[in-house]
Amino acid sequence: MDWTEKYRPTTLSEVRGNDKARDALKKWAETWDDHREAVILYGSPGIGKTSAAHALANDMEWPTIELNASDSRTKDVINRVAGEAAKSGTLTAGGGGRRLVIMDEADNIHGNADRGGARAITALVKEASQPMILIANEYYEMSNGLRNNCQDIEFRDVSPRSIVPVLRDLCRQEGVEYESDALQELAEQNSGGLRGAVKDLQAIAETTERLTADDVVTGERDTTEGIFEYLDVVLKEAGAQDALEASYDVDETPDDLINWIEDNMPKDYEGTELVRAYEFLSNADQWLGRVRETQNYSFWRYAGDNMTAGVAAARDGTKGGWTRYGPPSYWSKLGRSKGTRNTRDYVAQQIAAIDGVSMRTARREIMPFLATMTHHCRNRELTVAMAATYDMEAEHVSFVTGSGKDTNKVQDIVADAEALKEEAAVEHSGGVFEGASANGGDGDSDADGDAPDTDAGEESGDQQVTLAADDGAESDATSDGTTTDDETETASEAAEDDDQQSGLSDFM
């Protein structure tokens, strides 16, 4: 079990490293009847904002309603879920009839995925008759209207002096032997982030019987310079063992490091060595998936072996020259303009709706996977299938693949995706669009191949599927119910072909 969850504070008195913010939050709660204002908790990730909010709820005996980034946060959802909770109390014995509404990542409400959400939150904090806590990393990413109608409390980065006692307590709780210097090194490396220090401690503790300073990467490191030097070592110079040892000096988790390597590897590798390297990256990705599923961080070791030693071993000798390495294109796009965030959120919403996963899973797991599989549209057939499945326009395909949206390549892919959707709507809808029934009929309906019309605006691609399926069902109801052998064989072949080329949800 993840130690950050296992040992999450249950009362405010257990929250470490932000005494001033903790006291201010307690005062806000105790005087809420006097001011009736929402409060914004803001600061860097991993420093205890969400934990403090839940600990406060326990102290005040307030039931909680939480809406986070993994949920759809449109105007309707906010009004239905958070709105009802914020305007009505509870009949439970404790807490004075109050309930606490917690909205995580309140600074990350953008675009189609959360349409109207920001305005709905602003209206809600003005009208709420129950206490509300908004949690944000970037205070000024929220609108002026929202900030002006809330109190605010800043959570500062946690100092190493406050982190060390927490790590010491965890070691005692888990029966881990340790050297004091090792805990100090961990705290300094994660200065500012208590959650990161705890995760690092768990990862190391699960791979050794006694935690020593040698187990901890020493020295303060510059992440950007370190990663570029490391890429030079792995992709050009080092053998397998040296590449593995070099990874210990890079301030990146395996989840992040694999993206750096994958995005820059094709700049130095080609042909069979690139194929071999991708096989090692695939193995590493499987081990990382097991970490996410089991929370067993000892599997990080095997992921690291594959993505570092394996990738280095796949190379045919050393390489010279200078290479312009860069951050993973998928990451770099995430921090750009609001328009890019809108594009990202549309893609995430489509994935979430069609694959039946949360927005968080769509953003953090499936989108990076798609970006890798369709990088620069090299696998054209798969890219067309992706665009058809998730109803993508040129800007969406460009965002995921890293190719320019105005290029002929992307435009042709979008056109082929439209043709694939039209064909699926006429012949069958079980392949490209999972869950829809076959669109039958008497052969005369939709003979021109046009897809059924959908409402403009907020209707997404999955609504298009529903309409196509409904039309087919209605047509079936009016037909004579007979089907020829040729028609059955054709439909079967089409479904089989479609399963092979566009069943993204299946193989994911």
UniProtKB/Swiss-Prot annotation:
A biological process (GO) annotation for this entry? DNA replication
Which SUPFAM superfamilies does the UniProt record give? P-loop containing nucleoside triphosphate hydrolases
**Signal peptide (residue range):** none
Keywords, A to Z?
ATP-binding, DNA replication, Nucleotide-binding
Where along the chain is composition biased (Acidic residues)? 443-461, 483-500
Q: Which Pfam families match?
A: AAA
The molecular function terms of the Gene Ontology recorded here are: ATP binding; ATP hydrolysis activity; DNA clamp loader activity
Q: Which residues cross the membrane?
A: none
Residues binding ATP, per UniProt: 43-50
What does the subunit section of this Swiss-Prot or TrEMBL entry state? Answer: Heteromultimer composed of small subunits (RfcS) and large subunits (RfcL).
Q: What does this protein do?
A: Part of the RFC clamp loader complex which loads the PCNA sliding clamp onto DNA.
Q: Mind telling me which NCBIfam families this protein's record contains?
A: PRK04195.1-4, PRK04195.1-5, PRK04195.2-1
User: What is the designated name of this protein?
Assistant: Replication factor C large subunit
Q: Identify the species of origin.
A: Haloarcula marismortui (strain ATCC 43049 / DSM 3752 / JCM 8966 / VKM B-1809) (Halobacterium marismortui)
Q: Which gene encodes it?
A: rfcL
